[in-house]
C-alpha cells in the first residue's frame, strides 16, 4: 500500500430511528408498487456537484488535495445513471446559497429525483464555502415540499463529504469473521430527503491526497457495481462496510495515524429508491 498521507475535511487540525421496508417492485410486471419511488419520468434529474478545493486565506483552511479526483469520479458515476451533472468549483457561501435557491426554483416536474453532492471542509451542521461556513439546513430547506413543489414526493439526496467535528476513531479489534396520489394526501415538508454523510457526527472525515476521500471512492465503486441491482439504502450499507473495513489513515503525526471512519446515513425517505426502472 502506498504511504500517501491522509487528510481531514475540517477547518483545521487545531436519537435517529431507522426502519426496514420489505418489498419494492413486481418482479413479473416491472411495475412500481406503492412502496417504491417512481423513477420513470422523462429525466432522472439534476446532480449538482459543489467541489470546494481552495479557500480564502483569512479562513485558515487548507487546500483539499484529492478532491478533484472525487468530483470527476462522481460526475462519471451519475452521468452513467443518466443524471444531468452540473459541476461547480470553489464557490463562496453566498454563491452556494444562490445556486441552491436558483436550482430549487427550476421546474423539476419531468425529473424523477434530485441529487446534491458537497465536497468541502465542514463541522457539525455546517459546510464551508471558500470564504466561510454556512448551515447545511439553510441549503436543504430550499427543497422542502412547501418551497419546491415540483420535487414534492420525489427523493432528494444530499451527499456530504466533510468533517463533522474533531473526534478521532481509533477502531477496535473484532473476533467475528413520485407518486403519492397527491390530490388528497398531505405529507411532511421534510419528507423524502436523504443525507449521506461521509462520517458520523462529531468526527473527522478522511481524504487521501491522491485518490480522494474514502467515502466518495467507496460510494462510486458501490454505485457502479450495484446501482442496477440493489435498492439505494442497501448500497449505502455496503458503502459503510467498505469504508469501515478497508481504510485506515496514514499520517506522519502519530495522533492522526491508523484511524478509522464510519459514514452515516440519515433518511427521511418514505419509499424504496432504485436507480433503474
UniProtKB/Swiss-Prot annotation:
Reactions it catalyzes: Strict requirement for an Asp residue at positions P1 and P4. It has a preferred cleavage sequence of Asp-Xaa-Xaa-Asp-|- with a hydrophobic amino-acid residue at P2 and a hydrophilic amino-acid residue at P3, although Val or Ala are also accepted at this position
Keyword Nucleus: no
Residues carrying N6-acetyllysine: 11
Residues found modified as S-nitrosocysteine: 163
Cellular localization per UniProt: Cytoplasm
Protein's GO biological process: apoptotic process; erythrocyte differentiation; keratinocyte differentiation; neuron differentiation; positive regulation of amyloid-beta formation; positive regulation of neuron apoptotic process; proteolysis; regulation of protein stability
Pfam families, per database record: Peptidase_C14
Residues the record marks as active site: 121, 163
Activity control mechanisms: Inhibited by BIRC6; following inhibition of BIRC6-caspase binding by DIABLO/SMAC, BIRC6 is subjected to caspase cleavage, leading to an increase in active caspases.
InterPro entries: Caspase-like_dom_sf, Caspase_cys_AS, Caspase_his_AS, Pept_C14, Pept_C14_caspase, Pept_C14_p10, Pept_C14_p20, Pept_C14A
Gene3D superfamilies associated with the record: 3.40.50.1460, Caspase-like
List of residues that carry N-acetylmethionine: 1
Quaternary structure, from the entry: Heterotetramer that consists of two anti-parallel arranged heterodimers, each one formed by a 17 kDa (p17) and a 12 kDa (p12) subunit. Interacts with BIRC6/bruce.
Role this protein plays: Involved in the activation cascade of caspases responsible for apoptosis execution. At the onset of apoptosis, it proteolytically cleaves poly(ADP-ribose) polymerase PARP1 at a '216-Asp-|-Gly-217' bond. Cleaves and activates sterol regulatory element binding proteins (SREBPs) between the basic helix-loop-helix leucine zipper domain and the membrane attachment domain. Cleaves and activates caspase-6, -7 and -9 (CASP6, CASP7 and CASP9, respectively). Cleaves and inactivates interleukin-18 (IL18). Triggers cell adhesion in sympathetic neurons through RET cleavage.
Name listed for the protein in its UniProt record: Caspase-3
Amino acid at each position: 500500500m502506498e504511504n500517501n498521507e491522509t487528510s481531514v475535511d475540517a477547518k483545521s487540525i487545531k436519537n435517529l430511528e431507522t426502519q426496514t421496508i420489505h418489498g419494492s417492485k413486481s418482479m413479473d410486471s416491472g411495475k412500481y408498487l406503492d412502496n417504491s419511488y417512481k423513477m420513470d419520468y422523462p429525466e432522472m434529474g439534476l446532480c449538482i456537484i459543489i467541489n470546494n478545493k481552495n479557500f480564502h486565506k483569512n479562513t485558515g483552511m487548507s487546500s483539499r488535495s484529492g478532491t478533484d479526483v472525487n468530483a470527476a469520479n462522481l460526475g462519471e458515476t451519475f452521468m452513467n445513471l443518466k443524471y444531468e451533472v452540473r459541476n461547480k468549483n470553489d464557490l463562496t457561501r453566498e454563491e452556494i446559497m444562490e445556486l441552491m435557491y436558483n436550482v430549487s426554483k427550476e421546474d423539476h416536474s419531468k425529473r424523477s429525483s434530485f441529487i446534491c453532492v458537497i465536497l468541502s471542509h465542514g463541522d457539525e451542521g455546517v459546510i464551508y464555502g471558500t470564504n466561510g461556513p454556512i448551515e447545511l439546513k439553510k441549503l436543504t430547506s430550499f427543497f422542502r415540499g412547501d418551497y419546491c413543489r415540483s420535487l414534492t414526493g420525489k427523493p432528494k439526496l444530499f451527499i456530504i463529504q466533510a468533517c463533522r467535528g474533531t473526534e478521532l476513531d481509533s477502531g477496535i479489534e473484532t473476533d467475528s469473521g413520485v407518486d403519492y396520489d397527491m390530490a388528497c394526501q398531505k405529507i411532511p415538508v421534510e419528507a423524502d430527503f436523504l443525507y449521506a454523510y461521509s462520517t458520523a457526527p462529531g468526527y473527522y472525515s478522511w481524504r487521501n491526497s491522491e485518490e480522494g476521500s474514502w467515502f466518495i471512492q467507496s460510494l462510486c465503486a458501490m454505485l457502479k457495481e450495484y446501482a442496477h441491482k440493489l435498492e439505494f439504502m442497501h448500497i449505502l450499507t455496503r458503502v459503510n462496510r467498505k469504508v469501515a473495513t478497508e481504510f485506515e489513515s496514514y499520517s506522519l503525526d502519530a495522533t492522526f495515524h491508523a484511524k478509522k471512519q464510519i459514514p452515516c446515513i440519515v433518511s427521511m425517505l418514505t419509499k424504496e429508491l432504485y436507480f433503474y426502472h
